[in-house]
Each structure stands twice: as structure tokens, then as C-alpha cells.
Regions:
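Generic structural signal for well-ordered alpha-helices
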Residues: 21-29, 57-62, 87-91, 125-129, ...
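Canonical Radical SAM [4Fe-4S] cluster-binding loop centered on the CxxxCxxC motif
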Residues: 1-19
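Alpha-helix N-cap and loop-to-helix initiation/capping positions
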Residues: 19, 52, 56, 116-124, ...
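Conserved SAM/AdoMet-binding glycine-rich loop
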Residues: 34-117, 127, 134
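Conserved C-terminal portion of the radical SAM core fold
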Residues: 123-174
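Loop-centered beta-sheet repeat module
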Residues: 107, 118-122, 141
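Conserved residues at the C-terminal ends of beta-strands
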Residues: 7, 76, 173
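Auxiliary alpha/beta "docking" domains used to position bulky ligands
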Residues: 17-30, 45-46, 50-51
Length: 174
């Protein structure tokens, strides 16, 4: 997509050269400067976090989900990168601790989707939501407001569409 940086939009995350546990500990130290608390969400944000081998992903996710301070595993990905095996893995992880999957939709308008090089059509998104929900996994949808050439009406149509989907959250980005 044209809106991701070379860091996969995870420019403020801990170094990917660190282990998952080391990244969690670094994140805890960073957040302790502003917030108090002892419960955290392990958020796999940068890049497409279901685009790797099943074994590799399972190792990463298990390291995060078994950390004693992690309460939720949140995974950002593309709807077209959810194979049956990945969905089964997420379902199994969801039995250990809650799993949220953040799907990058950005917009329902195909012209805008082509402009940002989203790479898949709306039915792929709808199928991903359906498959995740069948497995009891909560879905958060990432949208981008005010894409070039989109009107206020276009934005409202995207939000109205999402209001009729079986999703549990919307991430709005300007």
C-alpha cells in the first residue's frame, strides 16, 4: 500500500532485532513513563503479521501470549493473508487469551482502493470477517479518512457499511 513507511507503519515500535519478550519489556518501560498499570496488549502492528510460515508465527504469538503481563494478543494484517491454517492457529490462541485481529480495509470505495494499492476487493474483506467471527475472534477494522478524492459522503458510506458488519471496533486514521 502507498501509505505504509519502510518500517511497515511501525516506526515507533521496539527494534525487530529484539525477541518478542524483550520488545514487550521495552514497551512496558516506555509506557511506564506516562501510564501506570500491569496489563498490556501485545500488538503486532508493523507489516502484515500473518505473512510468514505457520511455525514462525506460532512461535512469535506464543511468546507474546504466554507473557504474564499480556492480557490480549492483537494482530494487524490484510484480509487476503488469512489462510485456513492461520485462522486455525488464531482460534487456538484465542482459547488461551483473547485475540483481536485488525484488518486493513481503509475504504469501501474501489477507486480509492486501487489508488492506495490495497490489493484486494471488498468480498475478500467480508470473507475474512466471517471466518474470524466463526472462530470467536474479535475484529477491528482499520480505516483511513479523507483519502484523496473521497468526499464526506464517501467517508460516511464506509462507516455506514462497517456499522452493518460483525466487527467489534473501528480504528480511524486521518
Amino acid at each position: 500500500c502507498i501509505f505504509c513507511s519502510h518500517g511497515g507503519s511501525g516506526d515507533f515500535a521496539a527494534s525487530r532485532t529484539l525477541s518478542v519478550t524483550e520488545q514487550i519489556e521495552a514497551g512496558k518501560q516506555q509506557s511506564a513513563k506516562k501510564y501506570t498499570g500491569s496489563s498490556y496488549i501485545a500488538y503486532f502492528q508493523a507489516y502484515t503479521n500473518t505473512y510468514a510460515s505457520l511455525e514462525y508465527l506460532e512461535t512469535l504469538y506464543m511468546e507474546a501470549i504466554t507473557h504474564p503481563d499480556i492480557r490480549i494478543l492483537s494482530i494487524a494484517t490484510r484480509p487476503d493473508c488469512l489462510s485456513e491454517k492461520i485462522l486455525d492457529l488464531l482460534e487456538n490462541l484465542n482459547r488461551i487469551k483473547p485475540v483481536w485481529v485488525e484488518l486493513g480495509l481503509q475504504t469501501i470505495h474501489e477507486e480509492s482502493a486501487r489508488y492506495i494499492r490495497r490489493g484486494y476487493e471488498l468480498p475478500v474483506f467480508e470473507n475474512a470477517v466471517s471466518e474470524l467471527r466463526k472462530r470467536g475472534i474479535d475484529v477491528i477494522v482499520h480505516t483511513i479518512l479523507c483519502l484523496p478524492n473521497e468526499t464526506e459522503q464517501d467517508i460516511l458510506k464506509t462507516i455506514e457499511y462497517l456499522n452493518h458488519q460483525d466487527i467489534q471496533g473501528i480504528k480511524l486514521q486521518l
